Amino acid sequence: MTQAATRPTNDAGQDGGNNSDILVVARQQVLQRGEGLNQDQVLAVLQLPDDRLEELLALAHEVRMRWCGPEVEVEGIISLKTGGCPEDCHFCSQSGLFASPVRSAWLDIPSLVEAAKQTAKSGATEFCIVAAVRGPDERLMAQVAAGIEAIRNEVEINIACSLGMLTAEQVDQLAARGVHRYNHNLETARSFFANVVTTHTWEERWQTLSMVRDAGMEVCCGGILGMGETLQQRAEFAAELAELGPDEVPLNFLNPRPGTPFADLEVMPVGDALKAVAAFRLALPRTMLRFAGGREITLGDLGAKRGILGGINAVIVGNYLTTLGRPAEADLELLDELQMPLKALNASL
């Protein structure tokens, strides 16, 4: 886990006066000093008028280039266990509590290895094994262990896992098997979490992340934007992530799934999504910020390009867990067009 972002000592939303322009403040504080914006300052960014969006994106890109460099990390993900989850995350079609078309299924080890091979061929350095569970039982841990061993024997790629909430023993087991990074999203601001999930708490997720950090694995933690949270809660979420100090923050945008409680929510407006991308970059200047699920329906091709030029420095290629993504070739062509080099495997170890 990266060191928690340096926070400004001035708690004023505009860092030194009500008449200060937030982008001028951000240029001095974030770009020049590498200090992330605080919660009030992030809110001021999110509240900027649309006619300042391009200026905001340009600044976020400068911050990304200065504090993270030009390289882009590419990752692929695969679902080892799909569907049948006992939790009630309102955005998720894999919950067994909703009338969703997704049914429970397991992936066999040869298919897992083949997926890892295809991911590596795309230029990705990270392959994440995901399971739709509250937390892994003995069967799942054994399957994950077998999968990790099989992949290591045939594919040169970093292995990440996303298996829900863990016990201390399970954390140690994954670390001992060389898991490079563990993903467990907080999903949204603490104050909004009960509107999204009722079968477990925000604090339970935080506890898993703390154990992962203490075990020496990299921490991947982000969430989903556009689930009905206010701008104030969006800013709160950015500040909470900055306090956590993860190595990677995946930004998802709600793609309303049939049969879920959020099925009828509207897709997040493009301008709001891009402002959020830039705002999270200004809150987390040194953190890997990854485009994840929902960007296709929310941003489209042009929006994705603007996001990569507005603070993003990592992408998931190919399909997601239950929804289609962009073809890997399309993302790689875009990165080549933008002259963004891919992060090499040896640089990510």
UniProtKB/Swiss-Prot annotation:
[4Fe-4S] cluster binds at residues 85, 89, 92. The keyword Iron applies. Disruption phenotype: The deletion mutant is unable to grow without extrabacterial biotin. Cells lacking this gene are shown to be highly attenuated in a mouse tuberculosis model. Residues 70-295 form the Radical SAM core domain. [2Fe-2S] cluster binds at residues 128, 161, 220, 290. Gene3D superfamilies: Aldolase class I. It comes from the Bacteria. Its EC number is 2.8.1.6. Optimum temperature is 37 degrees Celsius. The enzyme is stable up to 40 degrees Celsius and deteriorated at higher temperatures. One of its GO terms (biological process) is biotin biosynthetic process. GO terms for cellular component: peptidoglycan-based cell wall; plasma membrane. Pfam families: BATS (PF06968), Radical_SAM (PF04055). Belongs to the radical SAM superfamily. Biotin synthase family. Homodimer. This is Biotin synthase. It comes from Mycobacterium tuberculosis (strain ATCC 25618 / H37Rv). The gene is bioB.
